[in-house]
Amino acid sequence: EDNEQLLLIIGATAALQALKSDVASGRLINFDMGIPAKVGRAMDCLDNDKWWGEPKAIQAGLTVILPKSAEDEAEGWKALQDATDIGLQTGVRLSHATYASIANMKGREDYLRDSLKRFESIPVATLNSQYTLLNAMAELQVRHIANIYWMKYEGHRAPTENFSKFWDEQEKPSQALNQLLDDL
C-alpha cells in the first residue's frame, strides 16, 4: 500500500508540474483542466504527515494556481508554507520544491525568496536517507529555480552555497574595517 501511495504522490506532483507548464506556455499544451480537481481529491486519501506534507502542498499549489478568490489564494500560500514545515520535520524536501515552483510560476518573489530560504535552511544531515532520490530531485528543481532568479537580477547563476542569501541582503564591510584598510 505504501508503494501505491508513493506512486500516487509522484503522479500528482507530475500533474501539478504539467499544469504549471501549461499555464506558463499560455495553454499551448492543452492540459486537461479536469485533472486538477481529481488530483486534489486524491490527495485527501493520503496521510499528509506520513508523506512529508506533499499532499497538502499539492492541494495548496492547485489553489494558488487556480484560486476561486483572493482569500483562497492567501490560504493556499499559508498551506504551502505549513507543508514545508512538515517536510522539514520528516527530512523530505519535496514540498519545498513544490512551494518554490508555484512561487516562481506565479511571479511572487516574496514567496520565492521565502521558499529558497526554507529549502536551504534544512541541514543535509537531517535528510531522510530512505528518500534520497526524491530529495535529490527536489534539490535539482529548487537549484534550477534559484539559478533562473539569480540570472534575472545578477546575470549569473546562484552561488553553490548560500543561494538564499540574496544580493540585496549581502553584508557590507563595516566602516571600521574600511578605515583599517585606508590606514595601510
Please report, for each region that a protein language model flagged, where it lies by residue.
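Helix-turn-helix repeat elements of alpha-solenoid scaffolds
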Residues: 27-39, 70-77, 113-116
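Flexible helix-coil transition and linker loops at the boundaries of alpha-helical arrays
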Residues: 1-7, 41-50, 85-90, 124-132
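Amphipathic alpha-helical repeat scaffolds of TPR domains
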Residues: 1-24, 49-65, 93-101, 140-145
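Short amphipathic alpha-helical segments and their helix-coil junctions
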Residues: 34-44, 77-81, 120-124
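Terminal alpha-helical segments
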Residues: 26-27, 52-53, 65-75, 79, ...
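Well-ordered, non-transmembrane segments within structured domains
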Residues: 24-47, 51-53, 60
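Extracytoplasmic/secreted proteins, especially bacterial periplasmic and envelope-associated proteins
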Residues: 38, 59, 75-78, 137, ...
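A cross-kingdom marker for long, charged
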Residues: 82-86, 90-184
